[in-house]
């Protein structure tokens, strides 16, 4: 067991050294990083990504840290409100003096802070977004990098899957944001010659408390395929609405919604509609018996038990948080024995990593002109209570 617990840290933690600090956030014994996550508010389900990352950093610290320094991760609740993200990010930079901003959740949230951080030349790394405005803008905002697969590429995967079926009539519900628009643009690209099979589109605002009118319009379109380019709260509402209408289309749901703590609610209230749903996956599912003997899943459970005992192991956002933290530790390790903001950015843009939290065959690769770390993803189908592979790995590049 001890070897299993150590293997991930051994891959990314180097021998201790005794050097004085110099860069902001770096002392002889610590590296301070920070970010915001929605612990409350409409996207509170995502809050676990901060807790999972924090638990992983504590595990790394318990095994020597990175180049002899312990990681201090300060994550604050922005309630998914970009204005709060700005306020709290300034606090992290100007009061906590962080080396870098890490793991900020949300596309609009990341966009709200990138000008400030790029002007100050502060790394904004591995944010919870796959938006083209961030991934494609490595020249205009070189200090900003997301972590999720390209939303556009995710949409392309769905479009190609739908295009391979006979006589699709497609209805689309999407968030009126770069997240939802990128997914929908990718969907249309993937549909190719069948882009005309989209018979209805409806948008919602991230602050909406109901999507009944949108779902009613989509239902009335007669579509036999429903694409949900949405966040978890609205995925649940959409499934419940389809169930209420007695509407049973083939459903594609965005990858940010596939955690068991989302789909268990859907399955309990709209089992027929949930069955056979399609999405993409890139991290392992620690609740799936397929991974029951996987060493990193065992590591994940042991880390939560020791460093976040109140966390639920079945919450996949905890697992994702550890996965993104693994990559951050790798970047910090390669930033040198005396890391600076510039050396950390260089390390983050030269990754070639096998991240054990990812599904087999998915690597973390970046270059100064490729800011989409996750290389591939897999189309998966919801079968009773778990997601199973529905197709080979596909490109997740922008």
Where do the model's predicted regions map?
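Short, low-complexity disordered leader/linker segments with a strong preference
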Residues: 1-32, 394-398
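Extracytoplasmic "Venus flytrap"
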Residues: 21, 25-54, 76-83, 105-108, ...
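Beta-alpha junction/loop-to-helix N-cap segments that form part of ligand/metal-binding clefts
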Residues: 21-22, 32, 45-51, 62-136, ...
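Extracellular/periplasmic Venus flytrap/periplasmic-binding protein
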Residues: 83-87, 131-133, 140-246, 290-291
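Periplasmic-binding protein-like
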Residues: 92-105, 123-127, 169-174, 222-232, ...
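Extracellular/periplasmic periplasmic-binding protein-like sensory domains
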Residues: 242-320, 393-395
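Segments of small-molecule ligand-sensing domains
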Residues: 306-318, 327-387
């Amino acid at each position: 067991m001890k070897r299993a617990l150590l293997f991930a840290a051994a891959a990314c933690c180097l021998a201790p050294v005794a050097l004085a600090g110099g860069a902001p956030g770096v002392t002889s014994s610590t590296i301070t990083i920070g970010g915001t996550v929605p612990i409350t508010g409409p996207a509170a389900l995502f809050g676990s990504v901060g807790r999972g990352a924090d638990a992983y950093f504590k595990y790394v610290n318990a095994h020597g840290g990175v180049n002899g320094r312990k990681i201090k991760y300060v994550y604050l609740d922005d309630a998914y409100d970009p204005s709060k993200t700005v306020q709290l990010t300034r606090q992290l930079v100007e009061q906590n003096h962080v080396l870098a901003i890490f793991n900020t959740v949300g596309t609009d949230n990341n966009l709200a802070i990138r000008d400030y951080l790029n002007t100050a030349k502060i790394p904004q790394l591995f944010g919870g977004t796959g938006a083209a405005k961030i991934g494609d803008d490595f020249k205009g905002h070189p200090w900003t990098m997301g972590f999720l697969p390209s939303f556009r590429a995710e949409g392309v995967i769905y479009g190609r899957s739908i295009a391979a079926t006979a006589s699709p009539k497609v209805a689309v519900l999407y968030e009126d944001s770069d997240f939802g628009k990128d997914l929908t643009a990718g969907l249309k690209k993937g549909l190719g010659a069948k882009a005309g099979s989209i018979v209805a589109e409806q948008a919602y605002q991230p602050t909406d408390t109901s999507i009944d009118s949108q779902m009613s319009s989509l239902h009335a379109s007669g579509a036999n395929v429903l694409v949900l380019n949405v966040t978890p709260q609205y995925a649940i509402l959409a499934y419940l609405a389809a169930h209420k209408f007695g509407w049973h289309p083939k459903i594609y749901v965005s990858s940010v919604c596939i955690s068991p703590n989302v789909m268990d609610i859907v399955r309990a209230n709209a089992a027929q509609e949930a069955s056979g749903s399609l999405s993409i996956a890139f991290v392992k599912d620690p609740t799936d018996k397929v991974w029951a003997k996987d060493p990193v899943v065992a590591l994940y459970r042991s880390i939560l038990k020791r460093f976040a005992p109140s966390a639920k192991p079945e919450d996949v956002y905890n697992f994702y948080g550890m996965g993104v933290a693994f990559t951050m530790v790798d970047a910090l390790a390669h930033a040198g024995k005396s890391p600076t903001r510039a050396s950390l950015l260089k390390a983050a843009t030269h990754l070639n990593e096998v991240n054990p939290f990812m599904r087999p065959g998915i690597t973390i690769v970046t270059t100064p002109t490729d800011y989409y770390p996750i290389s591939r993803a897999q189309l998966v189908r919801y079968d009773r209570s778990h997601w199973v592979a529905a197709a080979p790995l596909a490109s997740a590049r922008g």
